[in-house]
Curated annotation (Swiss-Prot):
Subcellular location: Nucleus
DNA-binding region: 47-115
Organism whose genome encodes this protein: Xenopus laevis (African clawed frog)
Record protein name field: Transcription factor Sox-11-A
Subunit-level organization: Interacts with nlk.2.
Coiled coil residues, start to end: none
Lineage per the UniProt record: Eukaryota, Metazoa, Chordata, Craniata, Vertebrata
Stretches for region Disordered: 1-24, 114-170
Entry function: Transcription factor that binds to the DNA sequence 5'-AACAAT-3'. Acts as a transcriptional activator. Plays a role together with nlk in neural induction during early embryogenesis.
Record-linked Pfam families: HMG_box
Listed PANTHER family: SOX TRANSCRIPTION FACTOR, TRANSCRIPTION FACTOR SOX-11
Keywords: Activator, Developmental protein, Differentiation, DNA-binding, Neurogenesis, Nucleus, Transcription, Transcription regulation
Composition-biased stretches (Basic and acidic residues): 1-11
């Protein structure tokens, strides 16, 4: 009985020692065929990484689980092994940590030039794999080339020489890249070409450029308005070179010969009054030409001014041009202080609107026969 009990106890202890030895044999290099120089290489020649403590332990436990439940999925086995490894104490992990260190040193001795380089898995596009290779997307039309061929928001030339404002833009498409060729048609001096750099900017930068362009347009508009305002008085005076009324300057000694043109712009039509042969005439100092008091009309038309001139011509015919006058002077037509804007802008006023009263200046101006009493000399051009 004693022998049989000893035999039974020895039989019970042997499996335990076998399992422990088997575990260490599984994690030892002998199980990996240490004699083989390619013990840590794959069939393709890739050198595997040295196992750490968890890999040594999980390799042993994975074999046990696969023997007990061969139908269990590999992902489920890994999940259970991870939970169990976290529940182990540090004392239970020590033998596996030592075995992993020994394997690491052996790995360094066998493969001194080894460097960890993780494999780069090629990204497989399912849509591209389904299509035949002849119909695959060309590199010229790939999304990358589209993003690269994105339009530039603003193209600013570097001003050189005269700083030409116009640029001839030519886009040449070659090999999936857009090349912009800019040439300045107006080159000053040595015909320096404007070098333009295309910069891909964000939306914020595009908004800033648009604001800058708006400011530049406003500045150009203000400069244009200012130039028009500067040119406007000159245009007015050039178009409407019209005196308010003819004046008599008795101080000048020379006679004025020629024609004076009256210009009046009303509703797009021009009215010309040409007085010819205004020469030095002998007049009677006592004789004066008086105008019948007429109410000044608020609105004058060419017909009203024609009637007024006709009255003046009738009064001029009543004078005697043959009597000598030593105090007669020259007739000159000059500008007076009158706002010419009313004439050029088509206002309702006229140069021939006289007030109801006759001032001394007016009586002196129209004194004497300073126009010949011939209707042929009064040319009215409408």
């Amino acid at each position: 009985m004693v022998q049989r009990a000893d035999m039974d106890s020895s039989q019970h202890t042997e499996p335990s020692t076998d399992t422990e030895e088997g575990e260490f044999m599984a994690c030892s290099p002998v199980s990996l065929d240490e004699s083989d120089p390619d013990w840590c290489k794959t069939a393709t020649g890739h050198i595997k990484r040295p196992m750490n403590a968890f890999m040594v332990w999980s390799k042993i436990e994975r074999r046990k689980i696969m023997e007990q439940s061969p139908d269990m999925h590999n992902a489920e086995i890994s999940k259970r092994l991870g939970k169990r490894w976290k529940m182990l104490n540090d004392s239970e992990k020590i033998p596996f940590i030592r075995e992993a260190e020994r394997l690491r040193l052996k790995h360094m001795a066998d493969y001194p030039d080894y460097k960890y380089r993780p494999r780069k898995k090629p990204k497989v596009d399912p849509s591209a794999s389904s299509k035949p290779p002849a119909l695959t997307q060309s590199p010229e039309k790939s999304p990358k080339s589209r993003s690269a061929g994105r339009k530039c928001p603003k193209l600013k030339p570097s001003h050189s020489g005269s700083g030409s404002k116009s640029l001839s833009i030519k886009s040449e498409y070659s090999g999936g890249s857009d090349e912009y060729v800019f040439g300045s048609p107006k080159a000053s001096g040595k015909a320096a070409a404007a070098a333009v750099k295309c910069v891909f900017m964000d939306e914020d930068e595009e908004e800033e450029e648009e604001e800058e362009d708006d400011e530049e347009e406003e500045d150009e508009l203000q400069i244009r308005i200012k130039q028009e305002e500067d040119d406007e008085p000159l245009r007015q005076y050039n178009v409407a070179k019209v005196p308010a009324s003819p004046t008599l300057s008795s101080s000048s000694a020379e006679s004025v010969e020629g024609a004076s043109m009256y210009e009046d712009i009303r509703n797009g039509t021009r009215l010309y009054y040409n007085f010819k042969n205004i020469t030095k005439q002998s007049t009677i100092p006592q004789a004066t030409i008086t105008l019948a008091p007429r109410p000044a009309p608020t609105t004058t038309s060419p017909a009203a001014s024609h009637e007024l001139l006709f009255d003046l011509s009738l009064n001029f015919t009543q004078q005697n041009p043959q009597l000598p006058d030593p105090n007669s002077g020259n007739v000159s037509l000059s500008l007076v202080d009158k706002d010419l804007d009313s004439c050029s802008e088509g206002s309702l006023g006229s140069h021939f609107d006289f007030p109801d009263y006759c001032t001394p200046e007016l009586s002196e101006m129209i004194a004497g026969d300073w126009l010949e009493a011939n209707f042929s000399d009064l040319v009215f051009t409408y």
